[in-house]
Amino acid sequence: MSGKKYFIYKVCATLIVMLFTRASLYAQATSLIEDDGRKVVASVADSLSPLYAQPIEFADTATIEMQPTDSVQKKLRFGKRLINFFFKANTPDPNKRVDFGFLPGPHYSSTQGLGLGIMATATYSMDRSDPTLPRSNASLFSDMTTKGFLLIGLKGNNFFPKERFRLDYRAYIYTFPTNFWGIGYANGNNDDNETNYRRNRVDLMGRFLFRMARNTYIGPMLNFRYIKALEVSPGNMLTLFNGQDLTVHSQTAGLSFIYDSRDFMLNAYRGWFVQLDQTFTPRFLGNDYCFSTTDLTVSTYRKVWKGGVLAGELHGGFNYGNPAWCLMSEVGGNSRMRGYFEGRYRDKNIIEAQVELRQRIKKRHGAVVWVGAAEVFPRFDAMRWKRILPNAGLGYRWEFKQRINVRLDCGWSKNGPGFMFNINEAF
């Protein structure tokens, strides 16, 4: 072997030894031992290179106690905090006023491309001295992809002391390229109708509820929506959009009734949830498309065995009058009929149902399986059995915070599968 090659091999071997030495230091420095009830960093053997450690105390026996340098300690503290954040996030801390956490979520789809979503959640109590007061919650979510999808939103539920009042709110803004098939089941079922366009939307909703009896609330609600369709071909404006405006804004007011006996609203194990919204979008509020809407949701939850919960939901949305193309009832989304392209099937009315079995597998891991069905229709006499849309799927659950799950769902639709990554249970 030539002297040059021998020198190169010697340098490489030296570097490898140094790397393993540093890795060994990190492994030993992070182990903790109990000393008089205090956790201290374990001593590092004095045979390790002083490049990564410094002497801090000399004993009478001439032994040297070593400790990682400040830079190493900072890295260890950061790594420990990061590990604790993910592995102890579901451990409740009664001393925290707000239990907060966030989680990034990379994802990919053929329609949206490669994306990065960031989800954050917080739970808190308006009266910490009252253990019976449900914890309020707020969720912040954002997403962006390589194909031009951009979203940011906030939603939550706030319970005031003694449950006298309840505030539900939702706000989001997004822009993304999407598809449109037209209005009605027949148009949505025709693959040739698929047309591309860009959709911008702003949605603000709030309801302020007064407690009338145990678990029972009633109060006013307001909803502002702004939708704009861009990059639409002139021919599709007439055939698929029925000649309606591509820019729609609506100011809606109404009354909301809620009965909610769920033990925890973000991931219920037992109880009932009934919500009835009667809203009006009249001309005197500045609306070009005038209509009224009755929206009913009934959900129930029941423990069936250890770690198993059976959940069911029935939802109906009924529009009367002249709703715009973008304000009609739609099939699909993150909560119902998962796997369907949101809005492919749309009409004035919808009835949909789903049943889901949720099973905790081990520690923070769980799985779900569900079946569902839906139908959109212009009038009740136009309903047909053959137009019922089937749905089924399964999903993985990871408990990010206590009883707050990150979910990855795969749903099958009449037109193929779809994947969803989100936080909190679907319903």
Outline where the language-model segments fall.
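Gram-negative/organellar outer-membrane beta-barrel architecture
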Residues: 91-101, 107-249, 347, 405, ...
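Transmembrane beta-strands of outer-membrane beta-barrel proteins
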Residues: 100-102, 136-140, 165-171, 217-220, ...
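Transmembrane beta-barrel architecture of outer membranes
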Residues: 113-117, 149-153, 201-205, 248-254, ...
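Cleavable N-terminal export/targeting peptides
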Residues: 1-76
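Transmembrane beta-strand segments of outer-membrane beta-barrel domains in Gram-negative
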Residues: 57-82, 86-89, 107, 168-172, ...
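Residues on the lipid-exposed face of transmembrane beta-strands in outer-membrane beta-barrel proteins
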Residues: 104-106, 118-122, 154-158, 204-210, ...
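C-terminal outer-membrane beta-barrel translocator/porin domains of Gram-negative envelope proteins
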Residues: 253-258, 262-361
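Outer-membrane beta-barrel initiation region
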Residues: 44-168, 244-268, 360-366, 376-380, ...
